[in-house]
């Protein structure tokens, strides 16, 4: 079977190929009332936004110099000159995206296709370019500089390859915060992804230009610290929140510079929320796999013979570099979440692998919420339909994921996951949903290693290192019964962030999160319609959300696999 996604993505490659100078910002935001205006000092600017019925939006506010020309593949630079008047009523361009094939062989069952096409990772990106470092700010109508509202700072996901602020609208969160009497300001940050933001290699390391996407996020937080008070926000009450790569980024922000999250002597954030992501054990920027990625990009860009290959990459046309960075294996492919681009230790900003920083206590110890979807791995196991035996599964992990892991360790890991039709993900579905012979088994392993059991490692390690830091955890099951996918990775964006179904899961999540943003406790001021959510330290209980109800379960499932992962964690670096 060959499923063509050409009708869905027909415009995608065109958008990706747009040169920077043609990237347009022509998506107007409806202005129903007098335009709200804010004056900031750092950098000096007057910012004019758009007003809706209950929410004011300032879209496309620059927080860094455009990373173009000599600043391409360089750390972000703060804006130092006055900007005059900015009409912030149109979305800025998304950062360059990692495109993928429009035809997927035997990949997506038709029963799952419709749901997947609604998730942000499958959305069309019609406006992308290198000049992309902008913020979106949304606040309640009538907010003034004296309001001092708490701030929810959103970091989008997309496997460090895809995504942008235009895919997410925080107005429903602001509106709900008003309705609940817990008003907030919602801020989104853009950051460079793919090879533009996370190019590895020894040359990148020597140049001091690793993990640019994380540095973009950090500069965005610093901009908020300098300027959010003018919008009516309280810079001392910032909560950072992300999903998937955004959630991984949240912990990376907690761990950057050895856990120093201060700026001008004050903390950049006081709380954290991680939806589907935490620590990703990773080899250094100049590891062998990273160097292969860099060398392949250099070769694809025609820079192999250059005296300085990085200088060459900075000078090639935008479309040449875009195609070169996208010539390596991508997220939505056979290699799945064996990512080409991701945060890697650089010895300066991300000083060590995140798991080591966590265990050594080198992270900002702020209260946090962290959780997962029940079937995190199903979406990433759709592309390997040729795998039908345990031996092939072992080879797959050895070839694509864990190059330094002994075969015996990989075999031992697989042995903790039954090789039958009943077990595996989507979980609790008996004989159903085995898309190919090893699908449910592979989906379970991918989901556990990257998200679910790694979350448990994160929580238990954090409790050991910092037992007084409050934490809460959840497991979402609201899409139980969805064919093939179950409650899949990214489904919380549809259910919780966008609220496409106004059900218990959506309303409970918003109530808990808004209470946390306001008070650092998801139970403080939350309606009695929702149960008291115990801290993880109180018996390792997970809030378990279904579409129409919620409950609690113990975080002890798949304990044999968990124990094995903990005992062999050094073998599972990517």
Swiss-Prot record:
Against Gene3D superfamilies, the record matches this protein to: alpha/beta hydrolase
What is the consequence of disrupting this locus? Impairs all extracellular esterase activity. Does not affect host cuticle penetration.
Glycosylated position list? 323, 386, 524
Describe activity versus pH: Optimum pH is 6.
Q: How does activity depend on temperature?
A: Optimum temperature is 38 degrees Celsius.
Query: What is this protein's function?
Result: Secreted lipase that allows the use of hydrolyzed lipids as carbon sources. Has highest activity with methyl umbelliferyl oleate (C18:1), whereas much lower activities are obtained with the respective esters of palmitate (C16:0) and stearate (C18:0) (24% and 12% of the activity obtained with umbelliferyl oleate, respectively). Hydrolyzes 1- and 3-positioned ester bonds in preference to 2-positioned ester bonds. The production rate of monoglycerides is lower than that of diacylglycerides. Seems not required for the penetration of intact host tissue.
State what protein this is by name.
Secreted lipase 1
């Amino acid at each position: 079977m060959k499923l063509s996604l050409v009708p869905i993505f027909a415009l995608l490659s065109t958008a990706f190929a747009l040169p920077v100078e043609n990237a347009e910002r022509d998506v107007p935001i409806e202005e129903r009332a007098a335009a709200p205006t804010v004056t900031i000092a750092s950098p000096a600017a007057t910012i004019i936004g758009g007003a809706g019925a209950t929410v004011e939006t300032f879209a496309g506010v620059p927080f860094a110099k455009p990373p173009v020309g000599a600043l391409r593949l360089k750390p972000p630079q703060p804006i130092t000159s006055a900007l005059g008047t900015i009409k912030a009523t149109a979305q800025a361009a998304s950062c360059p995206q990692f495109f993928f094939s429009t035809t997927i062989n035997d990949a997506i069952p038709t029963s799952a296709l419709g749901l997947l096409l609604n998730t942000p990772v499958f959305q069309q990106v019609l406006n992308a370019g290198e000049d992309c470092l902008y913020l979106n700010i949304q606040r309640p109508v009538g907010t003034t500089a004296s309001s001092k509202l708490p701030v929810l700072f959103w970091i989008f996901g997309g496997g460090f390859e895809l995504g942008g602020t235009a895919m997410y609208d925080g107005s429903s969160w602001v509106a709900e915060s008003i309705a609940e009497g817990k008003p907030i300001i919602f801020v989104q940050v853009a950051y460079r992804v793919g090879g533009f933001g996370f190019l590895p290699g020894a040359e990148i390391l020597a140049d001091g230009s690793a993990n640019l996407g994380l540095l973009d996020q950090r500069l965005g937080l610093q901009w908020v610290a300098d300027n959010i008070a003018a919008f009516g926000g309280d810079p001392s009450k910032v909560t950072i929140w992300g999903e998937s790569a955004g959630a991984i980024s949240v912990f990376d922000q907690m761990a950057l510079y050895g856990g120093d999250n201060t700026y001008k002597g004050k903390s950049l954030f006081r709380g954290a929320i991680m939806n589907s992501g935490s620590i990703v054990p990773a080899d250094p920027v100049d590891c062998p796999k990273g160097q292969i990625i860099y060398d392949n990009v250099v070769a694809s860009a025609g820079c192999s013979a250059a005296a300085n290959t990085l200088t060459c990459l900075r000078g090639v046309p935008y479309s040449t570099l875009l195609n070169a960075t996208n010539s390596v294996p991508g997220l939505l492919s056979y290699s799945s979440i064996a990512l080409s681009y991701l945060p890697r230790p650089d010895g300066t900003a991300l000083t060590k692998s995140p798991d080591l920083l966590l265990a050594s206590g080198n992270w900002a110890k702020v209260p946090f919420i962290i959780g997962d979807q029940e079937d995190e791995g199903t979406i990433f196991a759709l592309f390997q339909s040729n795998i039908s035996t345990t031996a092939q599964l072992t080879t797959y992990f050895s070839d694509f994921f864990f190059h330094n892991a002994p075969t015996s360790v990989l075999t031992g890991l697989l042995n903790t996951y039954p090789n039958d039709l009943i077990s595996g993900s989507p979980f609790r579905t008996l004989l159903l949903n085995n898309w190919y012979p090893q699908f449910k088994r592979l989906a379970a392993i991918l989901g556990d290693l990257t998200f679910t059991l790694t979350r448990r490692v994160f929580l238990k390690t954090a409790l050991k290192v910092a037992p007084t830091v409050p934490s809460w955890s959840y497991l979402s099951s609201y899409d139980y019964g969805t064919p093939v996918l179950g409650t899949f990775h990214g489904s919380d964006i549809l259910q919780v962030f966008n609220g496409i179904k106004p059900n218990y899961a959506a309303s409970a999540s918003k109530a808990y999160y808004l209470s946390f943003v306001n008070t650092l406790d998801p139970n403080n001021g939350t309606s009695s319609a929702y149960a008291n959510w115990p801290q993880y330290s109180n018996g390792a209980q997970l809030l378990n959300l279904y579409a129409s109800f919620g409950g609690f379960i113990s975080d002890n499932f798949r304990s044999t696999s968990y124990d094995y992962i903990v005992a062999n964690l050094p073998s599972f670096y990517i």
